[in-house]
From Swiss-Prot:
Functional note: This molybdenum-iron protein is part of the nitrogenase complex that catalyzes the key enzymatic reactions in nitrogen fixation.
Cofactor note: Binds 1 [8Fe-7S] cluster per heterodimer.
CDD domains attached to this UniProt entry: Nitrogenase_MoFe_beta
Originating gene: nifK
EC number of this enzyme: 1.18.6.1
Keyword ATP-binding: yes
Name of this protein: Nitrogenase molybdenum-iron protein beta chain
Length: 520
């Protein structure tokens, strides 16, 4: 092999060398693999409308889910509270998955522990694991809050978190001064957004259940983001509220703990919503739920426990949605919209005008969580784009109906199709049969782009990376997608993807380069 200390190749150029190619050929002979022609025949068949029809008749099988499980969301919610240690009651392997998932997205260490239930706990229950786990976690990591969620193992055998935690405190395994909110988060129903919602309900019950709040006693607003992984969105919310001189509390704010500096000091806990902020939440003017399709239990808490209206707002993604949020904040707080925000809005409108000739009429397929997909679809319509294929694996029929209503109201949405309870293998079929210009989604879409390219350059559907997770590109999680600032970022991302593809399509010397222009 030609690997030397002076010339070290990574796997891509290394495995292209003759000796490795020969090794692969010899290995393939032992695998009893189908010949290349048969593989190509089957691949071509999976790109057809006939295969799509079979694909959509699947009932008991998910291939490449476009969602994750509940405890993942519960962990993210917990990370947003100050001095809080996420604690998962269940399998250690599950927690390794959650930590790895967030490690790869945020490029940060993720503090999260498990009480490592194994075979004996699966038979006799996990009470002993809970006792020892809470004792060790509090002694080793000195948290002020331990936020407990569950994996499938604990849920299948029916472990009672409330009783386990109460007994652990009574028996002295964990100090009574440590708050232990909890949520049942079974992975076999719902998704990561459900887990976030359930965990937030657990925090609300722990800190406010015994408090009779007085809405409006404090002249501030509460903002609840739901499952949100763009750290810039937390910062832009705080900036906009500060510019309007509106006091606010972001209830669950992980923007510091998931973006700590490299200065020689490890911060297991950094920033986050304090216990006092959570306790005072019922005294705020109102609580705005910024991703309402995923925050059903949170809405119930706000309206029934805190006696606040939970004034309806949509995810603040795009021009009109940000307008609506700021007007709602102004109405509730009595504060005018800041001149700086009006100026920022004007810049966004100018950008939309500058780029409309390249974005108008472009067809997009997109997938993701319900609120994100609805917000992005709305913004695409504002830009004159055509979102022809829209898929959300974890959405419901009410969401689908609301999406169709929004699409029918726009001339750019009348040819759109909305799919729910469908996975990325369904989406793959749709990319072949509908052939949009681009797809928008998380990193998993790169495999669909690769497959469309394998059919031929004319069939390629390039991926524009927006959403979660983003494993294969760096630092995108720090960006902003909400507010006018976020809309500017999205316009920039979309139009430059269009122009990159145009440059690629017109770069053949003497053949297509008559449109390989310097100015776009």
């Amino acid at each position: 092999m030609s690997q030397t200390i002076d010339k070290i190749n990574s796997c891509y150029p290394l495995f292209e060398q003759d000796e490795y190619q020969e090794l692969f050929r010899n290995k393939r002979q032992l695998e009893e693999a189908h010949d290349a022609q048969r593989v190509q025949e089957v691949f071509a068949w999976t790109t057809t409308a006939e295969y799509e029809a079979l694909n959509f008749r699947r009932e008991a099988l998910t291939v490449d889910p476009a969602k994750a499980c509940q405890p993942l969301g519960a962990v993210l919610c917990s990370l947003g509270f100050a001095n809080t240690l996420p604690y998962v009651h269940g399998s250690q392997g599950c927690v390794a998955y959650f930590r790895t998932y967030f490690n790869r997205h945020f490029k940060e260490p993720i503090a999260c522990v498990s009480d490592s239930m194994t075979e004996d706990a699966a038979v006799f229950g996990g009470n002993n694991n809970m006792n020892l786990g809470l004792q060790n976690a509090s002694a080793l990591y000195k948290p002020e809050i331990i936020a407990v969620s569950t994996t499938c193992m604990a849920e299948v055998i029916g472990d009672d978190l409330q009783a386990f935690i109460a007994n652990a405190k009574k028996d002295g395994f964990v100090d009574s001064s440590i708050a232990v909110p909890h949520a049942h988060t079974p992975s076999f129903i719902g998704s990561h957004v459900t887990g976030w919602d359930n965990m937030f309900e657990g925090f609300a019950k722990t800190f406010t259940a015994d408090y009779q709040g007085q809405p409006g006693k404090l002249p501030k607003l509460n903002l609840v983001t739901g499952f949100e992984t763009y750290l810039g969105n937390f910062r832009v919310l705080k900036r906009m509220m500060e510019q309007m001189a509106v006091p606010c509390s972001l209830l669950s704010d992980p923007s510091e703990v998931l973006d700590t500096p490299a200065d020689g000091h490890y911060r297991m806990y950094s920033g986050g919503t304090t216990q006092q902020e959570m306790k005072e939440a019922p005294d705020a003017i109102d609580t705005l739920l910024l991703q309402p399709w995923q925050l059903l239990k949170s809405k119930k808490v706000v309206q029934e426990m805190w006696n606040q209206p939970a004034t309806e707002v949509a995810i603040p993604l795009g021009l009109a949605a940000t307008d609506e949020l700021l007007m709602t904040v102004s109405q509730l707080s009595g504060k005018p919209i800041a001149d700086a925000l009006t100026l920022e809005r004007g810049r966004l409108v100018d950008m939309m005008l500058d780029s409309h000739t390249w974005l108008h009429g472009k067809k997009f397929g997109l997938y993701g969580d319900p609120d994100f997909v609805m917000g992005l679809t709305r913004f695409l319509l504002e830009l004159g784009c055509e979102p022809t294929v829209i898929l959300s694996h974890n959405a419901n029929k009410r969401w689908q109906k609301a999406m169709n209503k929004m699409l029918d109201a726009s001339p750019y949405g009348r040819d759109s199709e909305v799919f729910i309870n469908c996975d990325l293998w369904h989406f793959r079929s749709l990319m072949f049969t509908r052939q949009p210009d681009f797809m928008i989604g998380n990193s998993y879409g790169k495999f669909i782009q690769r497959d469309t390219l394998a059919k031929g350059k004319a069939f390629e559907v390039p991926l524009i990376r927006l959403g979660f997770p983003l494993f294969d590109r760096h630092h995108l999680h720090r960006q902003t997608t909400w507010g006018y600032e976020g809309a500017m970022n999205i316009v920039t991302t979309l139009v430059n993807a269009v122009l990159e593809k145009l440059d690629s399509d017109t770069s053949q010397l003497g053949k297509t380069d008559y449109s390989f222009d310097l100015v776009r």
